[in-house]
Amino acid sequence: MGRRKLWFALAAAGVIGGLVGIVLTELMHFIQHTAYGYGADGAYISFREGVARASEGRRLGVLILCGMLAGGGWWLLKALGKPLIGIKAALKQPLQGLPFLTTVFHVLLQIITVGLGSPLGREVAPREMTAAFAFAGGRRLGLDEDEMRLLIACASGAGLAAVYNVPLASTLFILEAMLGVWTQQAVAAALLTSVIATAVARIG
């Protein structure tokens, strides 16, 4: 029964990773299009070209807004939220996991500021949000420490796979960077979550 719970949680993490990738990507694009005023006609325009077409005043205003949201948002997060726990830290204490609401707020801040022009990368946000959802689900299922560690690592890779469409690279990322082991169970779990997340993102 315990193994069934684990593999159910891993498959669910793959689905969640794909959905998180879709939602966060669409949110980022919506913010980009709205902030810089392009793409309303449905025609594809790259972010770089869209920003270049915007007036200097609009670009300046968006960047000022970005700075205000980033500074104010992360100040509020630190003042009112629980301490942030990164994925690497969560893997060391998997039963402690990631604080759900704090992580979600942190992820949304990342996506909003990236959409407005912040140089932050967009790959951390889906990894963190997928891992936070997976931890919440794993805790409800009563997974033990080793199972939770595997789930958090695989969920993190699933978020990466969904955003960049790289299931095999994400599998290697989980095994090498997150877990540091190549057991049969770890390989199967990493591959399962990465492939499911990529498939869901492609369908979406």
Name each region found by the language model:
Residues 1-204:
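Alpha-helical transmembrane segments and immediately membrane-proximal extracytoplasmic
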